């Protein structure tokens, strides 16, 4: 099935068709598990088989990535660590973890830290997905949920701390 047909499928149909591809890679997921993820990736999928590489992090407890990916563009490991610590605090303080309510405080933090959005959001993206390229950040974080994002931020902080020494 090519990207034209993928883009024109409804969410439930596409979620159902993606389950076998996830199963082939060892992920025990249902169409209901895939349903909230489909809108995040549907426009980006060229083939159904790409689903695993684009969404595996939603179903993994431990992310395996190189700590160097956490170092922001034109930043040191120590700077990235300090900024990720501040971001973790800001995320923990959010009363609700919805994408539309997350974006403004995160952009305010970017300005407060004197960074470009791509610098901070790149660090956060790697921390929560283990990837430099992933579905839209705030939507992804909403699907993952606050507790999983904070746990992943904590692990990323540990990884960055080992680099910053």
Label each region the model flagged.
Residues 10-113:
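Small-residue-rich helix-loop
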Residues 5-7, 49, 58-60, 129, ...:
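Generic, ordered loop/turn and secondary-structure boundary motif
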Residues 99-161:
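Charged substrate- and nucleic-acid-binding regions of tRNA-handling and nucleotidyl-transfer enzymes
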Residues 1-8, 69-71, 133-140:
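Short His/Asp/Glu-rich catalytic/ion-coordination signatures at enzyme active sites or charged loops
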Residues 1-25, 107, 143, 147-165:
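Non-catalytic terminal extensions that flank enzyme cores
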Residues 1-4, 43-46, 123-127:
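Short, hydrophobic/amphipathic alpha-helical patches that form generic packing surfaces
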């Amino acid at each position: 099935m090519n990207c034209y047909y993928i883009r024109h499928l409804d969410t439930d149909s596409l979620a159902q068709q993606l389950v076998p591809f996830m199963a082939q890679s060892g992920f025990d997921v249902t169409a209901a598990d895939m349903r909230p993820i489909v809108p995040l990736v549907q426009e980006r999928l060229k083939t159904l088989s790409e689903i695993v590489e684009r969404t595996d992090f939603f179903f993994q407890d431990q992310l395996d990535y190189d700590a160097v990916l956490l170092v922001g563009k034109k930043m040191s490991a120590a700077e990235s660590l300090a900024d990720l610590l501040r971001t973790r605090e800001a995320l923990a303080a959010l009363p609700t973890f919805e994408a539309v309510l997350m974006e403004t405080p995160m952009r305010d933090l970017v300005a407060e830290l004197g960074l470009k959005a791509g610098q901070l959001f790149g660090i956060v993206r790697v921390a929560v997905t283990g990837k430099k390229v992933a579905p839209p950040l705030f939507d992804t974080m909403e699907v993952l949920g606050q507790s999983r994002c904070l746990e992943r931020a904590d692990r990323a902080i540990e990884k960055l701390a080992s680099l910053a020494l």
